[in-house]
Amino acid sequence: MKKKRMIMIVAMVLVLVWRAVESGTTQVSLQADWLQEGDYQYSVEEDETVTLRNYIGTESVIVTPKEVGGKEVTRIGDSCFLRKTDLRAVQISEGIVEIGESAFAEDGQYSDTTAGFISIVMPKTLKKVGKSAFQGTRITQIYFYDGLESIGDNAFMYCSSLSKIRIPDSVEKVGQFLFLGAGKPYEESQ
């Protein structure tokens, strides 16, 4: 009887340990759920659209893809291009509706006077720019189209080369410290 009881206890402990290990593995696989195509790591969202998660290429001039893995790209994820010092010019493809937090931040402007991108072309479909999206970059000008709804805190903080930006009347929410450490880049919408 004692032997049966001991076997039952050991079996129950093994089941509990197995379930704990299994659930831990599930959490790890959710974080590692990124796929890769070309120079981009990405995730497929619940609505079957794609978020670009990480750019692993070395090109200096890029156009973000409209499709990856046969699905439409609608977001540039948080930190996707963070500290990519090789970038000089970026064209964000039509269809992108959101640029995540720190997506293009810290392009190396403080480590090398020639580092960092200076040109970016925004899509007409863009609705949201996340916090610190371009913070600490050498970007010189940005033109946002009508339809943009929000710009997060610190989006252009320490963009010392920024000389011109167009923010349309459609913007309903503007974060704090938007231009702290930047020049006088604001241009009224027309």
Residue ranges: model-predicted function:
Residues K4-S23:
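Sec-dependent N-terminal signal peptides of Gram-positive bacterial secreted proteins and lipoproteins
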Residues I9, Q27-V28, K127, I139:
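Serine/threonine-rich, low-complexity intrinsically disordered segments
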Residues D78-C80, G100-A103, G130-A133, G152-A155, ...:
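Consensus positions within tandem repeat domains that build extended binding/scaffold surfaces
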